[in-house]
Amino acid sequence: MNESILDGKRILTVDDEPEILELLEEEILIACPNCKVDKATTYKRAVILLESTIYDIVVLDIMGVRGFDLLNLAVSRNFRVAMLTAHALNPQALKKAFEMKARTYLPKEKLGEVVPFLEDVMKYEYLPGWKRLFEKLKGFFDSRFESDWDKKTGLNWREWGKVCL
């Protein structure tokens, strides 16, 4: 097995569903057994961890734990953040995550593929990382969102090519 860029990293996962946290931890540790994964099921616990610990990546659920409030705190501490959602899977939430400087926006349906997305969060800077996300999930987003969602939200990522090279 190839060594992952996540190996040895400290990751905080936050979701109000303990089974999602268990699945995230399992997926991460299978690929990167030397990762340290902390978990929080409440906003309050997440704030305590975010304020007291340095993380390489923070994975935040949007809905049940006030994810956008936690995103603001995590970004203010210069943590790389991956937003995770099922209920807020819409172009407006995606745009908000982008504007608030999250590094990626993952549908919970893609939890089985979380490690490559988190590796991209570590490998790529902000715009190149989002461009890579859209390249990987364009078909998925197109099937879930209205047509031209990217243009209507102003997230016309195809135009970022020159910026991201």
Task: Show which residues each predicted segment covers.
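Conserved acidic segment of CheY-like receiver
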Residues: N2, D7-E19, L24-I28
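Alpha-helical interaction/dimerization surfaces of two-component signaling modules
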Residues: E26-A31, L49, K96
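C-terminal output/effector regions of signal-responsive regulators
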Residues: P33, K123-L165
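Acidic catalytic/metal-coordinating carboxylates
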Residues: T41-T42, M63-D69
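Conserved phosphotransfer cores of two-component systems
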Residues: E51-T53, L73-R80, M100
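A short, hydrophobic beta-strand element within the central beta-sheet of small alpha/beta folds
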Residues: V59, M63, A74, N78-Q92
